[in-house]
Structure formats: C-alpha cells, structure tokens
Regions:
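Adenine nucleotide-associated cytosolic modules
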Residues: 1-183
Length: 183
C-alpha cells in the first residue's frame, strides 16, 4: 500500500447540491454508479469543475467504459445526450448484473486513473471501450466530439449547474441475472 494515499468515506446521498464540493479536492473521479441520473450528475459536475473522470457501466455480461479529460475529447453527455426515458432500458434489478463484470470493468477504470495520475500510456479519451464476457471480445470505438452542440462542454453551454434527475437505483441485485431465454 502507498502510505501517501488517504481514503475518505462519505455517508451521504450525493446530489446536485453537494457534488461539486465533493469532487473539487480530487485529481481524478471514478464513476462506479448504477444508474443513468447519477452518471449524468457526475459527468456534468466533472465537466463544470474541469475534473477528469472514468465512466463505466455494466449489465448482465456486458460492460463499457470511457475516460473524459477536460479539453481532450467528448464527455459522457456528448455521447449519450440525456438520460433515457424511464423503462427504456432495463434496470439492474430487471436484467441482472454479474459481480465479476464489476471487477473486470472496475480494474480497467483503476488502470485509467493510475495512467492519468502518473502520466503514462494512452487513456480512453475519445473512445468507448466495450466488453462482452460471453464472447470475450473487447471493442474500442472512436467517439466524435461535437463541441458545438453539447449542453455542458460545448462552445455555448446551457447546463451551468449539475441536474438531479429522477432515479431508480439497483436494489439487492448483485449476482442476479436474466436467464438465456430472457436475453
């Protein structure tokens, strides 16, 4: 263990009123949340505070991640625009999450943070990395950045503060997953 690393825990709900203050003191943010509203909240706060971060998402046997560095590629909102409408995407409770997927994708996020912090290697800035555990295939997809239209990192931003969206959080779903018939 690195003796210079300090770990802080926060027993609080993170929302638009407190997220900017929470992330301000950190050098790199890792998004390990389980819902779209939280992902947009983290993205918007990181962009507004000029903080680099790694986004990740998992469901069933699939995962994805991307890294945002201010001024060096698209943010999460550039790629995904807005949270999907309620019921448009299955929740973790409906679809299930394989615990090992969190380990695989979380380890990749940790590597992104380490590379950024020590200044080595190529980050996933401008790319979306997807992983399918059923086929054991990774795909690195180049992402275009449309700075003219993004409402948070674009040339004329309209989102000037983080937004709280209605959210449904995964409840007690670790290890549950849909059967092959439901996929």
């Amino acid at each position: 263990m690195n003796p210079d690393v300090e770990v802080k825990t926060y027993r609080m709900f993170v929302d638009a009123s407190n997220i900017r203050g929470l992330i301000r003191e950190y050098d790199f943010i890792i998004d390990g949340t389980d819902n779209f509203p939280a992902k947009f909240l983290i993205n918007d706060a990181c962009v507004l505070e000029k903080k680099p971060f790694s986004h990740a998402g998992i469901i069933r046997f699939k995962g994805q991640l991307m890294t945002y560095v201010p001024g060096q590629g698209p943010c999460y909102r550039c790629v995904f625009k807005n949270p999907p409408p309620k019921d448009a995407v299955p929740t973790c409770k409906q679809a299930g999450v394989i615990g090992a997927m969190g380990g695989v994708i979380g380890s990749l996020q940790a590597m992104e943070a380490i590379k950024y912090l020590i200044g080595v290697g190529d980050l996933l800035t401008g790319y979306l990395l997807t992983y399918d555990a059923l086929t054991m295939e990774f795909h690195k997809i180049k992402l275009p950045k449309d700075t003219h239209k993004c409402p948070v990192c674009g040339d004329n931003p309209t989102i000037l503060e983080p937004i709280d969206y209605e959210q449904e959080i995964c409840e007690e779903t670790a290890g549950r997953f849909a059967t092959r018939d439901e996929q």
